[in-house]
Swiss-Prot record:
Endpoints of the signal sequence: 1-8
Family classification: Belongs to the venom waprin family.
Taxonomic superkingdom: Eukaryota
Known tissue expression: Expressed by the venom gland.
Protein known as: Waprin-Lio1
Function: Damages membranes of susceptible bacteria. Has no hemolytic activity. Not toxic to mice. Does not inhibit the proteinases elastase and cathepsin G.
GO cellular component: extracellular region
Length: 60
């Protein structure tokens, strides 16, 4: 068991796309990230409209 370990919280600039309107790329119904740190540069960990989190291109 590892004690005292933490995951660094990374918050990338920009915002997530709006999921109120169905958008096909957001329809991936599985979790692919937990925080922005799990995503490539320029992408954020966002709600995908299915109740899960996926990496999406940040909106500015």
């Amino acid at each position: 068991m590892l004690l005292g370990t933490t995951s660094a919280q990374v918050v990338r600039p920009g915002s997530c796309p709006n999921v109120d309107v169905p958008i096909p790329p957001l329809g991936l119904c599985r979790t692919t990230c937990q925080t922005d740190a799990n995503c490539q540069e320029g992408r954020k960990c966002c709600k995908n409209g299915c109740g899960f989190m996926t990496c999406e291109t940040a909106r500015f």
